[in-house]
């Protein structure tokens, strides 16, 4: 029988080790409530004490790196709440508790409730960023849910008056401490949403102990803040005070004064921004006007270069040059003919062939007559062509058209308006008349039938 059980035989060391591992792995970290006794603190700085109740007790140790975070000095007979790991001291086989944190029993229980509610609401998604509403920018009316006699309200109103005196503020007075406070805070949030007067709410109070701030760790308050259609800024206590309301709110402010800073505009800064914007707008307008003026000058010069009067003047100059060339050519031919006549006359006078001279003279006279008639005909033809060209240019000249009562309209970028689809109501157009320009705005566009 002994041989069949040898595989189950433990040494003392193995037994203690196995029990320690089971305790640490199965139990993990637990909260323990009890009364302190036999408290000692040796030179090492560690704490050793016993936790007991009416029927049992357990040895506890709290090492120096943990106990220095405790904010009070434990006393014999004091009721405390300890967060600890369960283990076994193997050399002696003593079962003991290794404490990680310690709180007075009343505050400790509240902290435990706080952690439980925080975990519950977090699991439900009430803290998720996707549910956070953006704050209005700027706010047109601020609602404040707090005590009407507390310092928090005074701080909020002082900051709002300094930063934006014209910003309307509606106060929803409520208790912020005591058994009735959570219900009043919930009703104030619901009332603000029902009345719809504000576009942002500040919910908060001044600093205090965990018990003082407990109304803002109430589940009813948390769910009312989450359900609010109006964005909520939580402002509970000081920067180190963190409540459930802070996690559920759309934004957490470290203090009531900071909440007022967040929801209000700084009028001086706003004035500087407006002045800066005006300056930038003025510079942009100056640049735009200078650019349009430069563009107008360029177009004006181009139009001047294409003006019908300039084109007519250039053609008149060309025609005058042609007339001069024709005159020079005529004079040259007459001179040549005269010289030939003189040479012929000289030869004839030397040979004295009188009949031949008469024929030649007659021929010369005919040539002179034909040449003169030809020149006159050419000049008359050129004058007629010139007159026709002038008449044609005057007929197609925009100035002549304008003189008959017509106008030419262009868009702001210089395009000539030919169809109504080139403009719409509200557009600006420029119209050229015979004696100047006018600028007008299109009121309506009606297609032709």
Swiss-Prot record:
It catalyses: Exonucleolytic cleavage in either 5'- to 3'- or 3'- to 5'-direction to yield nucleoside 5'-phosphates. Transmembrane segments: none annotated. It is found in: Cytoplasm. GO terms for molecular function: exodeoxyribonuclease VII activity; nucleic acid binding. One of its GO terms (cellular component) is cytoplasm. Its EC number is 3.1.11.6. Keywords: Cytoplasm, Exonuclease, Hydrolase, Nuclease. Its main location: cytoplasm. The keyword Hydrolase applies. GO terms for biological process: DNA catabolic process. Belongs to the XseA family. Bidirectionally degrades single-stranded DNA into large acid-insoluble oligonucleotides, which are then degraded further into small acid-soluble oligonucleotides. Heterooligomer composed of large and small subunits. This is Exodeoxyribonuclease 7 large subunit. It comes from Salmonella typhi. The lineage of its organism: Bacteria, Pseudomonadati, Pseudomonadota, Gammaproteobacteria, Enterobacterales.
């Amino acid at each position: 029988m002994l041989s069949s059980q040898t595989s189950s035989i433990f040494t003392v060391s193995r037994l203690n080790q196995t029990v320690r591992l089971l305790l640490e792995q199965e139990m993990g970290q637990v909260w323990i409530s009890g009364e302190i006794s036999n408290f000692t603190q040796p030179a090492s700085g560690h704490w050793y004490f016993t936790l007991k109740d009416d029927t049992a007790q357990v040895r506890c140790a709290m090492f120096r790196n943990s106990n220095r975070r405790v904010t009070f000095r434990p006393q014999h007979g004091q009721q405390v709440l300890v967060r600890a790991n369960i283990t076994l001291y193997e050399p002696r086989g003593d079962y003991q508790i290794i404490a990680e944190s310690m709180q007075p029993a009343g505050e400790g229980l509240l902290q435990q409730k706080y952690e439980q509610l925080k975990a519950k609401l977090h699991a439900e998604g009430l803290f998720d960023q996707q549910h956070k509403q953006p704050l209005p920018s700027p706010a047109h009316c601020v609602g404040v849910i707090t005590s009407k006699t507390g310092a928090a309200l005074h701080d909020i109103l002082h900051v709002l008056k300094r930063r934006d005196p014209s910003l309307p503020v509606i106060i929803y007075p409520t208790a912020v401490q005591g058994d009735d406070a959570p219900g009043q805070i919930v009703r104030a949030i619901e009332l603000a949403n029902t009345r719809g007067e504000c576009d942002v709410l500040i919910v908060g109070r001044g600093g205090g102990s965990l018990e003082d701030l407990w109304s803002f760790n109430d589940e009813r308050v948390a769910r009312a803040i989450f359900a609010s259609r109006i964005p909520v800024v939580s402002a509970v206590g000081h920067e180190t005070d963190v409540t459930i309301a802070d996690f559920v709110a759309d934004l957490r402010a470290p203090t009531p004064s900071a909440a007022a800073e967040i929801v209000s505009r700084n009028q001086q800064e706003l004035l500087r921004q407006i002045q800066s914007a005006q300056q930038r707008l003025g510079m942009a307008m100056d640049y735009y006007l200078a650019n349009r003026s430069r563009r107008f000058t360029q177009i004006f010069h181009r139009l001047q270069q294409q003006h019908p009067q300039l084109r007519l003047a250039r053609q008149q100059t060309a025609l005058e040059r042609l007339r001069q060339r024709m005159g020079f050519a005529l004079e040259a031919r007459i001179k040549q003919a005269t010289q030939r006549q003189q040479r012929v006359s000289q030869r004839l006078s030397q040979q004295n062939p009188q009949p031949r001279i008469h024929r030649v003279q007659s021929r010369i006279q005919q040539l002179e007559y034909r040449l003169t008639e030809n020149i006159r005909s050419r000049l008359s033809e050129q004058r007629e062509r010139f007159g026709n060209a002038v008449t044609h240019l005057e007929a197609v000249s925009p100035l002549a058209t304008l003189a008959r009562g017509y106008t030419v309209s262009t868009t702001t970028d210089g395009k000539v308006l030919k169809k109504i689809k080139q403009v719409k109501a509200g557009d600006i157009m420029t119209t050229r008349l015979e004696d100047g320009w006018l600028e007008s705005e299109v009121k309506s566009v009606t297609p032709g039938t």
